[in-house]
Amino acid sequence: MNADEAIVERWVERTLTSYPAETLPFLSGEQDPFRNPVGHTLRKSLATLAQELLGSMDKNRIAEALDALVRMRAVQSFSPADAVRFVFGLRAVMQETSGTVPESLQSRIDELALMAFDQYMSCREQIFELRVNELRSRMRYAVSGEEETE
């Protein structure tokens, strides 16, 4: 395992601790993306994010990986802080593995956290809008159903 793979693996481990303890063996052990979509998305997204943060910073790849991960955490009803806390976990992992976090990487991590927060809020807004629309639809149906019986 090279240094970048070790960083990703440690970042995945740290991020998995945000899930309930009883799910950790499954999330960390099951590799099948169909049986464990959460673990698969987490591994794939964090690997892409680490590659881009430590490399070229391709905004499109970052946005795609971040969207998959943050959307999943928004649906799982993480609080805003808990949903994006994984981003700051990379800083701790870098400190553990290399003993230092370059200023340029710290800035990239901060930028990623802001992007993650924006994405989380956008996802939560979409969820809220879906719920409101569903309630409106139910109300219309209930009202129209009552009118037909009168």
Per-segment meaning from a language model:
Residues 1-68, 99-150:
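Core of compact, soluble alpha-helical bundle domains
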Residues 78-97:
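Elongated alpha-helical scaffolds
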Residues 71, 86-87, 109:
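Generic preference for hydrophobic/aromatic residues in regular secondary structure cores
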